[in-house]
């Protein structure tokens, strides 16, 4: 499935229906008077957050959305029907911005959340509305009001419990594939992962969602590489798993590079709870493993987890560590 996390959309609510000019026509009633009904309201444009979506790709193929015009008023004081609404269905985690792509309109953070982006125009008054003591038979009615027209931006920030960060080839996609049913593309070259992947991990009968984003390189916060574009997807996570490949010559430098990029990006990423793990340890002998684990522990200030997604070594411990932080964060949110 293709991934799209930002797109521009054009929306227009429906125009109001016109009021009717009509007069009562009945046998034996010579001066029946006006009976033109009001026009119906135009349809609204709504946005709704739904489960089962994790990309905005559908909006690549349709960018224009217009609600229906209200039905015109009719004789016998009949009001026109309201125009049909249009609903944009977006993934949970989608933010809606004004045309400047900076002013936030609404953040769709819960399944079923709905928000009206544009209200339909009011229907026009029929001529019955204008009857007065000085004008018993008005021969005019109002047209309906025009609907709203605007350009908006949709920006997706995936909602996951844990986020995987690290340099390209740190083993993030292999980790995700080993502990979830997600099947990201895996190969031994940088930037194999070109867009975020989500997976559901289960440990001790408890589930949580993991997001894997493309690898970060030095200068990522300034737009170097592709990882910076997707850092927003781990802003909402409760914990980061920072993977450092055992194949790196200098594991301390690799750790510090990513740490610096997270700090430079901002968005609260540098303050987020972080678990550091030395990954791909199956490629090292015992002596090399001890040396690199010691160097990484010195750089990050705590002994790193030692894992291999290929042999499954350390995977259970890593998942339990993530689950523990997530559970503590959720408990804190509930108390607040």
UniProtKB/Swiss-Prot annotation:
Pfam families per UniProt: GTP1_OBG, MMR_HSR1
Keywords in alphabetical order: Cytoplasm, GTP-binding, Hydrolase, Magnesium, Metal-binding, Nucleotide-binding
Gene Ontology biological process terms in this record: ribosome biogenesis
Domain called Obg: residue spans: 1-159
Keyword Translocase among record annotations: no
Binding site for Mg(2+): 173, 193
GO MF term list: GTP binding; GTPase activity; magnesium ion binding
Cofactor(s) required for function per UniProt: Mg(2+)
Cellular localisation: Cytoplasm
GO cellular component term, pick one: cytoplasm
Enzyme class: hydrolase
Hydrolase as UniProt keyword: yes
EC annotation from Swiss-Prot or TrEMBL: 3.6.5.-
Residues binding GTP: 166-173, 191-195, 212-215, 279-282, 308-310
Domain OBG-type G: 160-327
Protein purpose: An essential GTPase which binds GTP, GDP and possibly (p)ppGpp with moderate affinity, with high nucleotide exchange rates and a fairly low GTP hydrolysis rate. Plays a role in control of the cell cycle, stress response, ribosome biogenesis and in those bacteria that undergo differentiation, in morphogenesis control.
NCBIfam families recorded: Obg_CgtA, PRK12297.1, PRK12299.1
Family named by the database record: Belongs to the TRAFAC class OBG-HflX-like GTPase superfamily. OBG GTPase family.
Known partners and oligomeric status: Monomer.
Full protein name: GTPase Obg
Organism: Rhizobium meliloti (strain 1021)
Source taxonomy: Bacteria, Pseudomonadati, Pseudomonadota, Alphaproteobacteria, Hyphomicrobiales
Gene: obg
